[in-house]
Swiss-Prot record:
Keywords: ATP-binding, Fatty acid metabolism, Ligase, Lipid metabolism, Nucleotide-binding
Pathway(s) this gene product operates in, as recorded in its UniProt entry: Lipid metabolism; fatty acid biosynthesis
Organism: Mycobacterium tuberculosis (strain ATCC 25618 / H37Rv)
Domain of life: Bacteria
EC number in record: 6.2.1.-
Record-level GO BP terms: Actinobacterium-type cell wall biogenesis; fatty acid biosynthetic process; lipid biosynthetic process; symbiont-mediated perturbation of host innate immune response
InterPro entries, per the entry: AMP-bd_C, AMP-bd_C_sf, AMP-dep_synth/lig_dom, ANL_N_sf, FAAL/FAAC
Pfam families: AMP-binding (PF00501), AMP-dom_DIP2-like (PF23024)
Role: Catalyzes the activation of long-chain fatty acids as acyl-adenylates (acyl-AMP), which are then transferred to a multifunctional polyketide synthase (PKS) for further chain extension.
Matching CDD domains: FAAL (cd05931)
UniProt name for this protein: Probable long-chain-fatty-acid--AMP ligase FadD30
A Gene Ontology molecular function term of the record: ligase activity
Amino acid sequence: MSVISTLRDRATTTPSDEAFVFMDYDTKTGDQIDRMTWSQLYSRVTAVSAYLISYGRHADRRRTAAISAPQGLDYVAGFLGALCAGWTPVPLPEPLGSLRDKRTGLAVLDCAADVVLTTSQAETRVRATIATHGASVTTPVIALDTLDEPSGDNCDLDSQLSDWSSYLQYTSGSTANPRGVVLSMRNVTENVDQIIRNYFRHEGGAPRLPSSVVSWLPLYHDMGLMVGLFIPLFVGCPVILTSPEAFIRKPARWMQLLAKHQAPFSAAPNFAFDLAVAKTSEEDMAGLDLGHVNTIINGAEQVQPNTITKFLRRFRPYNLMPAAVKPSYGMAEAVVYLATTKAGSPPTSTEFDADSLARGHAELSTFETERATRLIRYHSDDKEPLLRIVDPDSNIELGPGRIGEIWIHGKNVSTGYHNADDALNRDKFQASIREASAGTPRSPWLRTGDLGFIVGDEFYIVGRMKDLIIQDGVNHYPDDIETTVKEFTGGRVAAFSVSDDGVEHLVIAAEVRTEHGPDKVTIMDFSTIKRLVVSALSKLHGLHVTDFLLVPPGALPKTTSGKISRAACAKQYGANKLQRVATFP
């Protein structure tokens, strides 16, 4: 079924069932709750659809509607309303006066948006953003909350029954060159089926589906859109939404919402699990039980085994089942999901010899191993999405334990980037494997840019190709380096290299977190941290650190999905724009 036909079916068969709930915390009048049933949602969607159909009635091409609005139910109605009208929706962040505003403006320009959908609250900021960053000042900006509900049914259902119906998902990478991934409704429905098959235990031949969804992830993000919109729509369960800001201000809200709703499904990046552990008190959890939680995905950034261990230990007293926590791997170029752990099994990890990993192949650590790297174990089988390890230079498939680029094949994979050069799209999305193993299609394959290896039905991720740090001819993975540094600094870390006359130099930038704040710590304390970090990297990794920066909490640049952007860190470092807490002798 298509997205819109599914919505129409929900509105017809279960019109009074709760569909979407938005928890708006910390407003001037206190916490507010906005609720919609399936029939109410369908009415709001058709209001948006009616406006867009009328606006684009004489168009000779498919129209595009960018959505740049606050997190909430208007965002949901805007996205679905554009699909319902046969338009191409483009989910984007709300302008908040930050660096990501440039990305929003450039994306509006890149997708040639015919209209921008927002709310009355954000309309002025949206107009200023698209005018400042190159989009036409004449692009109509429509406040979703001002549209009247029409009489009758305006959804162009037929437009939803083919692969042609699509949306653009802009990736959360560089702000200088935002790339819109073209995703069809077929891509989405395939990925939803893959998620249902791989995340939920099957009992009596049927999946044990969640009874609710809890999400604070931004709806403009690939994982936020899947968890906060597509999953509840196709499963037919209510979703409780709140904003990323509400979570950051009080991380305990996430655990509280999970405890208060029936068999919930949820997801978040790795850093959110660390925050939940550090910022959720016994008082916050008093009287709450997590024993009924269906699934919590840890994804969207590299999953750290220590984080999983600490999270399970912290919430074990509240009956959280280990098998409910699902480390996951995915990317926008394949809607979102690519791999997770085996259904019904708790998350596990394996220790490998770090020196062997640096040489390009995996060997289990032993009692004689000097340096070990612990990696999350994912499950790999012969069902789509297929995953193979390939030499990125020769395109030859690599054998068990050999580290290479992760390539993906499946019906959930996009056909390419919007407005991209044909050669780029062919190389990225239509790659061919040479000397493929039995049962492996020759093409088309998606090059992920990630490095990993396969052993049997186990799959491991070691890092990003572009972030690889090479020193003295040896490969070093930044995630491994950053894990070591965090043991001393406590905050988020970026390990990256800078080039000087063709020589690569390692730079470490670490957010310092102390009990009294960075302004209360002496230079002596900082010098001690630096000495310990430099010594550990030398002894454990054989690395020489050219520069070590301690920066205030929150100072490291991030992508729109909340991941530390190593490329942006390197760029700011080169321009001397990274704010230092202290300068070392």
